[in-house]
């Protein structure tokens, strides 16, 4: 049975697209046939993060409007066998996505994929609403910062009331918290909300903590999902999160301050 | 830094704990509003209009609160009448 997973946050710039690319790639790495769908109509960016921007011919809106088939619009990842991308349209037409059209595409994707990752746009407008409407599970991406936590709580309210599952009285969307851009050092100094603080306020299951890391920018510069950088702390933290998503219990890492060794301190090692 | 400053410094709340406190308050407040039905603001507006037909009151002299008590909800209407 295919699973639809929305990556959402309310607030912009917290790491939704980075997370969608990482989780999609992580699931495909583990043998699950996965598609990542960009819902940010007008501001397409998933293709850049996934490194397939030059291979976009048809997009999500073309499929909805019948100008292309799903087979034509799906972009196969060059690195992984099981991974596909459906790009967002660059149209400025705000009504390009319709609930009926998105539903039709989701049903068709369900037939051939195990996981459908919906990369939500920021905000609570139509694109964000439709990205979460058909979801079975939600990853709420949050930064340890007041406006992001507040917006995440608002999204949790919408997930619980404005989704198809809520409207049909079905089992509610399973919610996961993903804390990104986490700096254990600043938490220790009392300058940043800690994992426990955010968990206490939002009261949902913690999927993972992604440390603030230079590897994230390096990965997006190159169009390689950061999860493929196995040396990096962020890549490893995303791998752990994917394992947990698949039901495995693994301890949370990168929550403590990384202590530099004597030589590293002397020569100033880079992460 | 003298000794007095040292103790005062330790008492000062960290910015993270201020953030947590502020969030807990605003989130609790917004969750309360979220569970309220959509018609509540309209209901309040119309109630004020009806009362105004008879008594001269300001908007903030009428409070409409919906309280959830397990399997039933109580709509509480509180009108402060002006001095006669």
Curated annotation (Swiss-Prot), chain B:
Query: GO annotations under biological process?
Result: cell division; regulation of division septum assembly
Would you say which domain of life the source belongs to?
Bacteria
- Keyword Cell cycle listed? The answer is yes
- Where exactly are the transmembrane stretches of this chain? none
Q: Any idea which UniProt keywords this protein has?
A: Cell cycle, Cell division
Record has Nucleus as a keyword: no
Q: What does this protein do?
A: Prevents the cell division inhibition by proteins MinC and MinD at internal division sites while permitting inhibition at polar sites. This ensures cell division at the proper site by restricting the formation of a division septum at the midpoint of the long axis of the cell.
Homology family: Belongs to the MinE family.
UniProt name for this protein: Cell division topological specificity factor
For this protein's source organism, the top of the classification is: Bacteria, Pseudomonadati, Pseudomonadota, Gammaproteobacteria, Pseudomonadales
């Amino acid at each position: 049975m295919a699973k639809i997973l929305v990556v959402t946050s309310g607030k912009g710039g917290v790491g939704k697209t980075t997370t969608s690319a990482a989780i999609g790639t992580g699931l495909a790495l583990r043998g699950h046939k996965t598609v990542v769908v960009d819902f940010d109509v007008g501001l397409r960016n998933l293709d850049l993060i996934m490194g397939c921007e030059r291979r976009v011919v048809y997009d999500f809106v073309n499929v909805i409007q019948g100008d292309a088939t799903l087979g034509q619009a799906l972009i196969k990842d060059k690195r992984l066998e099981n991974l596909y991308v459906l790009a967002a349209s660059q149209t400025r037409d705000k009504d390009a996505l319709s609930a009926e059209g998105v539903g039709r595409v989701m049903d068709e994707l369900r037939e051939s994929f195990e996981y459908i990752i919906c990369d939500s746009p920021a905000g609570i407008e139509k694109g964000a609403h439709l990205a979460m409407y058909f979801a079975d599970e939600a990853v709420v991406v949050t930064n340890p910062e007041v406006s992001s936590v507040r917006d995440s709580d608002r999204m949790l309210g919408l997930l619980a009331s404005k989704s198809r599952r809520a409207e049909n009285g079905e089992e509610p969307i399973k919610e996961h918290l993903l804390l990104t851009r986490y700096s254990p050092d600043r938490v220790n100094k009392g300058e940043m909300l800690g994992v426990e603080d955010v968990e206490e306020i939002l009261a949902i299951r913690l999927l993972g903590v992604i440390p603030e890391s230079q590897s994230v920018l390096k990965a997006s510069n190159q169009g390689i999902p950061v999860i493929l950088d196995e040396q990096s702390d962020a890549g490893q933290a995303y791998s752990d999160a994917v394992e947990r998503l698949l039901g495995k219990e693994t301890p949370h890492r990168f929550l403590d301050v990384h202590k530099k060794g004597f030589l590293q301190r002397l020569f100033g090692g880079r992460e | 830094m003298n000794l007095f400053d040292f103790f005062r410094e330790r008492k000062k709340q960290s910015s993270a704990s201020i953030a947590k406190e502020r969030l807990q308050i605003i989130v609790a407040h917004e969750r309360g509003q979220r569970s309220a039905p959509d018609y509540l603001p309209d209901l309040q507006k119309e109630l004020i209009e009806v009362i105004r037909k008879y008594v001269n009151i300001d908007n903030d002299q009428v409070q409409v609160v919906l309280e959830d008590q397990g399997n039933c909800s109580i709509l509480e209407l509180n009108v402060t009448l002006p001095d006669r």
